[in-house]
Amino acid sequence: MSITNNMESPSDSEVRLTLNDRALWTKFCSLTNEMIVTKSGRRMFPVLKLTASGLEPNSMYSFLLDFAPADSNRWKYVNGEWVPGGKPEPHAASCVYVHPDSPNFGSHWMKQPVSFNKVKLTNKGNGGGQQIMLNSLHKYEPRIHVVKVGGEAASERTIATFSFPESQFIAVTAYQNEEVTSLKIKHNPFAKAFLDAKERPDQTDFHSLAGIPVSSPQVPSWYGRNGSTSSARHFTHCNSYGGESELTSVQDTAIPSYTSRNCMRNSYRGNARATPYTIPHKELTCQATSFPEPVPNDGFYPMFPNSELLPRTTLNNYSPAMGAYTNSSIVTSSDIQSGNNNNFFYSNNNNINTTDEVPTTYMTNDFNSFYNQSSNSGMPGTTYLPYQSSPVNQFYSYQPPYSTEIADISPTQQDIINAQNPYQTAWTPPLSYDGCSTMYNSITPYSSSGESTTSEMTLLATARYLQNLRL
């Protein structure tokens, strides 16, 4: 450490600055340290931190930083080492960086290390503010000036200037020495994204998963500015706090990547996914509902309700579930069941015993809708009447007072025509499959002679009896 004192009082001779992280700076110095300079400015690593002592606690001080040329050479990197490469460029007057805490009391500077972590190095002029312009491929040495503010003359004066030889570096636009690159990646917290994929346990080799060989490089090696080559690939890196940290690189030559002199906000190409992410989803399933299904025009029914994708079967095997028809609405009758064991009906019960349950005739108060509705069940001999959304609705199975031979009579198209014109000769009301006469209101059939026949009166009485049961 070199000190230049401009002492005017005995207390000024006691001012001392100690370089923090001296061991780390020494490692970089042994490898010839490199610092990145860019147009927009790049922060230093290692960060220049110092511990102050010997300041007057109640006096005001300012801390300033500038960079002085360490020699009169221009440098180049050849065959893995830095060698002088010609005369230097004219050195412009170096800008001075003023610490943002300046001016402040001596007690403030001594209670914690003085850190110059916000200074940026640039290779373009007129940076101003936090930027200091340096010439690329030139060696520099940082200098810290301690300025005392105030006093009797109310002026500023520099009381001491400190420099540290182990902090010397060569300004570069891209790292040349791989060992310097590795050391910065290892110690710089903002360069962890550029660690070798083999050294990071949380990395996944997506190239091997996709069957892509990683041994063959996909980009040419980097060529230096002076014609020298380097197998390292060079990157710049932006930290997540808005500022920019050290330029870092990747050692693993097996993973291809691009070279860049600009700030890369993404990690190297080897970390890219070879295959896109999969989107988890639920498999859509077809669910049956409890609503009746319209009758297909081709005379066949699907095996399950509301599913046109499944195979169809004939009417004899069709038994879908319908919420409107429950077991509570079925009245068993062993006498009627003797002629109807082969019939099927709608039910919500999966375990149907056809030996005890019988099909049902469904009743309505609307006579016209009775004849205008087509059979939704599609079964021969069964007439479907629209379901009335009323709490009074109940469905019954009724055993008629006449023989089962009449119960086997099915309504025909002529029966329906006759029912629509009840005053014609030899009118016979249509019958359901189980022998129950179809319900109607305010219809009194007469024969051509004007008197009701015995058969017609029997059917009329049966119809009225079933209406009373419904009410």
From Swiss-Prot:
**Which tissues carry this protein?**
Developing notochord.
User: What does the record give as the DNA-binding region?
Assistant: 24-196
* Pfam family for this entry, one: T-box
What residue range is the signal peptide?
Answer: none
Biological processes annotated in GO:
cell fate specification; positive regulation of DNA-templated transcription
Subcellular localization(s) per the UniProt record: Nucleus
Which CDD domains does the record match to this protein? T-box_TBXT_TBX19-like (cd20192)
**Any one Gene Ontology molecular-function term assigned to this protein's record:** DNA-binding transcription factor activity, RNA polymerase II-specific
Return the PROSITE patterns for the record.
TBOX_1, TBOX_2, TBOX_3
Q: What is its main location?
A: nucleus
Identify the GO cellular component terms for this protein. chromatin; nucleus
Which InterPro entries does this entry report, sorted A to Z?
A: p53-like_TF_DNA-bd_sf (IPR008967), T-box_DNA-bd (IPR046360), T-box_sf (IPR036960), TF_Brachyury (IPR002070), TF_T-box (IPR001699), TF_T-box_CS (IPR018186)
Q: Report which superkingdom the organism of origin falls in.
A: Eukaryota
* Keywords assigned by UniProt, alphabetized: Activator, Developmental protein, DNA-binding, Nucleus, Transcription, Transcription regulation
**What does the record give as the function of this protein?**
Involved in the transcriptional regulation of genes required for mesoderm differentiation.
- The protein's name: T-box transcription factor T
Q: Which organism is it from?
A: Halocynthia roretzi
